[in-house]
Curated annotation (Swiss-Prot):
It catalyses: cyclo(N(8)-(alpha,alpha-dimethylallyl)-L-Trp-6a-(alpha,alpha-dimethylallyl)-L-Trp) + AH2 + O2 = okaramine C + A + H2O. FAD binds at E43, R116, D318, G331. FAD-dependent monooxygenase; part of the gene cluster that mediates the biosynthesis of okaramine B, a prenylated indole alkaloid that possesses an unusual octacyclic ring system, including a four-membered azetidine ring and an eight-membered azocine ring, and that exhibits insecticidal activity against silkworm larvae. Within the pathway, okaC performs indole 2,3-epoxidation, facilitating the formation of the hexahydropyrrolo[2,3-b]indole (HPI) moiety of okaramine C. It is a single-pass membrane protein. The gene is okaB. InterPro entries: FAD-bd (IPR002938), FAD-dep_Monooxygenase_BioMet (IPR050493), FAD-dep_OxRdtase_2_FAD-bd (IPR003953), FAD/NAD-bd_sf (IPR036188). The keyword Cytoplasm does not apply. Pfam families: FAD_binding_2, FAD_binding_3. This is FAD-dependent monooxygenase okaB. Pathway: Alkaloid biosynthesis. Keywords: FAD, Flavoprotein, Membrane, Monooxygenase, NAD, NADP, Oxidoreductase, Transmembrane, Transmembrane helix. The active site is at R194. One of its GO terms (cellular component) is membrane.
Length: 450
């Protein structure tokens, strides 16, 4: 088959419609623009909030992609927003400390952790600086495709392109239209609550001195974790800015309430007898609407395909493979999707767009699916620890896993290396065997990344 060079003139530029202005959509826009494709992005909301939600971590396998944006310009832009997550200090509910552990793959110089809203806003501003057309308040109400093009319907108008990328997130309406599939839910028996506190909330409250006070400000920022029966609590600090975000996973006995105070009351009920209960309550009580999320944790059955029947439309990111927060890879896998898609379109060229999307799916589908499995495995591993005496005997059991096949992976190098092999397998009707997953195709707790 013919592999195209990166150079393209106006008539050969691939026109791409991207739906959704989250991490997946913005990464796809930036990556595709960087490969010379013509991109337009549609988002139903009328504005972006500069700060929203809790924190999100991008692992080294995604950061190696965004590190190239503007020859490092983007990473310099977000550096002031980053939390230092080099280490984790872990204790149990009695106050017993298991020690401090290195956080591989998310540490300084490898990955980064920021407020979710701030990351999306920074990506949006960077994309706009590149001249990428972004249309806010433009809800996509329909999708369509022919053998030669694909498009969307916005405000009653049909807009055409060579392909459509649906990156609408976990609640995507386009997923069913494009793939003909519903993402089935299976509850895990657990729920999670998360919150973000900035200096406007924390700076005047002495009750938070135990985590952000002057004495603590001298200490190194890190991730603090507490393990207890049926509850796991974590706090990540940015002491120089008086900021933190927290995360609590708990059994369904603490099912999220309809209001913030009700949810927190239920969590505190599950933390009866905890040595740090009163301290953690001071953090949770500062939760505000717009910066607090509480949800039942459910796994989503993998989609059989991410493609439309004529293969000119594809779903990526959470719309395709939403993972539990415990995977630590939701945003990172979206970036891998985006980078792989851009390269496949570059190599296939305008005449083989359908093949490019098919190769993207082949290179990414199984990998994303196993990462989804990992989210559940990590959640169950953390939540099912009930023998705390055994943990004291071997504290390394509480170390966060860091599999090399996930965190040390270079999705761009892999896409360039494997494109022809995957394309020929598709054209010949043969199975493509990916090499970016464990040999047995299963997730396991590994501690071997750089």
């Amino acid at each position: 088959m013919t592999v195209h060079s990166a150079e393209s003139n106006g008539s050969n530029r691939i026109v791409i419609i991207i739906v959704g202005l989250g991490i997946a959509g913005l990464s796809a826009a930036i990556e595709c623009h960087g490969k010379g494709h013509q991109v337009m992005v549609f988002e139903k909301y009328s504005d972006l909030k500069r700060t929203e939600g809790d924190g999100i971590s991008i692992g080294s396998n995604g950061a190696r992609v965004s590190a190239k944006w503007g020859d490092g310009t983007f990473h310099e832009l977000i550096r002031p927003l980053e939390y230092q997550t080099n280490k984790a200090k872990v204790s149990d509910y009695t106050g017993y400390s298991y020690g401090t552990f290195e956080l591989h793959g998310y540490n300084e110089g490898r990955g980064y952790t920021v407020n979710r809203g701030q990351l999306v806003y920074a990506m949006h501003e960077y994309a706009r600086s590149l001249g990428i057309p972004i249309f806010l308040n433009s809800e996509v109400t329909g999708y369509w495709e022919t053998e030669d093009e694909a498009g969307v319907v916005v405000d009653g108008k049909r807009i055409s392109a060579d392909c459509v990328v649906c990156a609408e997130g976990i609640h995507s309406s386009g997923r069913l239209i494009i793939t003909g599939q519903k993402m089935e839910l299976k509850e895990t028996g657990y729920a999670a609550s998360r919150g973000y506190l900035d200096a406007c909330v924390t700076s005047q409250d002495s009750k938070l001195n135990w985590i952000l006070g002057e004495e603590e400000a001298e200490a190194e920022d890190c991730v603090y974790g507490w393990l207890g029966p049926g509850v796991h609590f974590g706090i990540t600090t940015k002491k120089r800015e008086n900021e933190l975000f927290w995360y609590c996973s708990h059994k369904d006995a603490c099912t999220p309430s309809k209001d913030i105070d009700g949810t927190i009351n239920q969590i505190l009920h599950c933390m009866e007898g905890w040595a740090a209960r009163d301290q953690l309550e001071t953090v949770m009580r500062k939760a505000k609407k717009g910066r607090f999320v509480s949800e039942t944790l459910a796994i989503r059955t993998p989609l059989a395909t991410w493609l439309s029947p004529k293969r000119r439309m594809i779903v990526i990111g959470d719309a395709a493979h939403a993972a539990l927060p415990s995977s630590g890879q939701g945003g990172t896998q979206a970036i891998e999707d985006a980078a792989t898609l851009a390269i496949c379109l570059e190599l296939a060229g305008k005449k083989d767009v359908a093949l490019a999307l098919s190769v993207t799916e082949k290179l990414r589908h199984q990998r994303a699916q196993i990462v989804q499995q990992g989210g559940l495995a990590v959640l169950q591993f953390v939540m099912n620890h009930v023998d705390f005496e055994a943990l004291r005997t071997d504290p390394t059991m509480v170390k966060p896993p860091h599999p090399a096949w996930i965190l040390d992976h270079d999705c761009q190098e892999y896409a360039y290396r494997e494109f022809v092999k995957a394309a020929e397998a598709i054209q010949d009707g043969e199975e493509y065997v990916p090499h970016n997953i464990p040999r047995d195709g299963k997730y396991s707790m590994e501690y071997n990344s750089q």
